[in-house]
Amino acid sequence: MTFNHKKMEPKWQQYWSEHNTFKTTEDKNKENFYALDMFPYPSGAGLHVGHPEGYTATDILSRMKRMQGKNVLHPIGWDAFGLPAEQYAIDTGNDPEEFTALNIANFTRQIKSLGFSYDWDREINTTDPEYYKWTQWIFEKLYENGLAYEAEIAVNWCPALGTVLANEEVIDGKSERGGFPVFRKPMRQWMLKITAYADRLLDDLDLVDWPENIKDMQRNWIGRSEGAEVTFKIKDSDETFNVFTTRPDTLFGATYTVFAPEHELIEKITTPEQKEAVEAYKKQVELKSELERTDLAKDKTGVFTGAYAINPINGEEVPIWIADYVLIQYGTGAIMAVPAHDERDFEFAQQFGLNIRPVLEGGDVTKEAFTGDGPHINSDFLNGLAKAEAITAAIDWLEKEGIGSRKITYRLRDWLFSRQRYWGEPIPVIHWEDGETTLVPEEELPLLLPKATEIKPSGTGESPLANLHDWVNVTDENGRKGRRETNTMPQWAGSSWYFLRYIDPKNSEAIADKEKLAEWLPVDVYIGGAEHAVLHLLYARFWHKFLYDIGVVPTKEPFQKLFNQGMILGENNEKMSKSRGNVVNPDEVVEKYGADTLRLYEMFMGPLEASIAWNENGLEGARKFLDRIWRLLVTEEGTLAEKVTTDANANLEKAYHHMVKTVTNHYENLRFNTGISQLMIFINEAYKQDTIPKQYVEGFVQLLSPIAPHLAEELWEILGHTETISYVAWPTYDETKLVEDEVEIVLQVNGKVKSKITVAKSLGKEELEKIAQEDNKMKENLEGKTIRKVIVVPGKLVNIVAN
């Protein structure tokens, strides 16, 4: 006998919708719990089975917390700006807004079919002007506080996409989407000064409960380095340049210097003989992406400028080279090379026959760079010193001589905040003909994205908005002409603050009401994929800290606990993708097995954080378990089974209380697979009984309800209840019922285990000795032997010594 999910699931989804069951309660007498999913980008492909894994996890927590008497905020929304919709519009001539709306409708249908307990009244959409009004407002505040500025930046320009890409969107010199060639080109861009928050972004990782590997990824991305900035003079010139080094103690081993090909001094210092070679090399570098330039495995390339610098610590002349592995945007765009003790410098020196001088004892620098530590040699006043003392002594000397100073640098760059795209938030800025730049007045926000009948690249590198002359060109009341900013914001903008808007989504006066923000923040648990470890999470933390500084939000950090679910792979352990043809559509699973089966299966596959292959057999196993519950509790006629009675059953007492305790604990700690195992153990025990107390059945159904909510609601109704199960108080357990009153005793002959028995904990030595001697296996082993001694350790063992 099986239940009909096709009838049951729509019935309860309709009930929840009509009764607004999951509307967020804001009862001042209750604690609050905020469970957040990384909101999806509504793609044309729709939901895949990877999406519901994280969503089911937050849903289980949300449903449990409601039953535990908390106000629960569990919202959903759409990260709906983005390149695919624009690409689709350019390719087909359709409107990205209409395309996005269709995709959202499809995602909504799919998500509702899975029975998630979202509060749909709080649904948000980053492309809604009432939403992006506040994204624009945050940009204006950043600008007013000196954290948004314009700069000429060498960017990743992709002519085929007609846009500039962030470094992360470029893979091996090609665009991540579409695989088109990418070139370096200087362009006017908006930047956000995330570097101003580098130390706080680093230090405040200690305030949050996040996976250590994610914290490490952020620490490495921020990349704080302590060292010294050193000034080098250029021979026969008044020019100087600075280099940053974490090892100023190795200056005596600096035998050449390298500039980034874009360094402004190259033009001035290159000798006439080297000019042609230098120009040719610079052209070659323009075609390379940052990743190609810094690839450790590639052959080193470079060219000599003909000029020399003076090493400030020993007065030596050292040649100045240019090479693509030095990037203008990192450090000062120039490095001092110590080839004896750095692998990259060593390879470069070997390739071009440059001097290699060891300044640390150890290794054989004729064969390879020595990157270990040892006492200093060939280093004048640093000779014999160990690393830490030598660094201090070198910096002290540089500061005394006025040619260097202590310095902290970061790998983190400012955030490139503009995109040459149509389908994004307009940046609320006007550039006037007299050179002034002003913000669109706050009371005029939102600055609406204009409708475009045809979206096509402008061809100039500007966004398609540049084609909309009526929108772009403006005149102020004094007749002064201006142009609106044609760049739009990146997709990261709307997702950097969306969790705040859920708290008060209809507020037209502010991002959200201050009191409400204080009640709900920080987010209690945030679940999503590890692929957002750096960018989204770093950007959201940066905006949150800025909003904290200007008094908008009450907390330093947005997300208290972060959890990354693993990836659901195809049946052959490969990533699911359209190109591989191994994507599983949840619609098909819901149709065949039901949403509860999908939810149960995804939670039972293995630990939530593990990446696991999809398996149809596992899906069938999950459905069989739900059918097994149904058969145990419900008759063919759909009424409550006769074996469910009001009578007590001592045989199930311990199993029930153990289940309540462990399942609650496992759910709290996101160990859903082991929680489900406990539900299965209880059902196995219940099948062995002639009667099952109704109270235990109700408790079981409540524990099942966060995982399989439709089936649980149906069973709850069959149990005689007229209200939803969603707010019934969570089951409790009695610790005294869990006390073990029995214990396993090991029985030994001459110290070797021969048998094991389970006995009452209270048995004394004499009783244990008697039981041991009467045990059949012990009798066999003692036959024909004389007992010399009996050792009894109550609660543990009986050892009979015999010969």
Curated annotation (Swiss-Prot):
- Family in the record: Belongs to the class-I aminoacyl-tRNA synthetase family.
Keyword Transmembrane helix (UniProt): no
Motif 'KMSKS' region positions after renumbering to this chain: 575-579
Which reactions are catalysed by this chain? Answer: tRNA(Leu) + L-leucine + ATP = L-leucyl-tRNA(Leu) + AMP + diphosphate
Q: Which organism is it from?
A: Listeria monocytogenes serovar 1/2a (strain ATCC BAA-679 / EGD-e)
Residues recorded as binding ATP, renumbered to this chain, are 578
Check the record and name the CDD domains matching this protein.
Anticodon_Ia_Leu_BEm, LeuRS_core
* Name of protein: Leucine--tRNA ligase
Indicate the enzyme's highest-level EC class: ligase
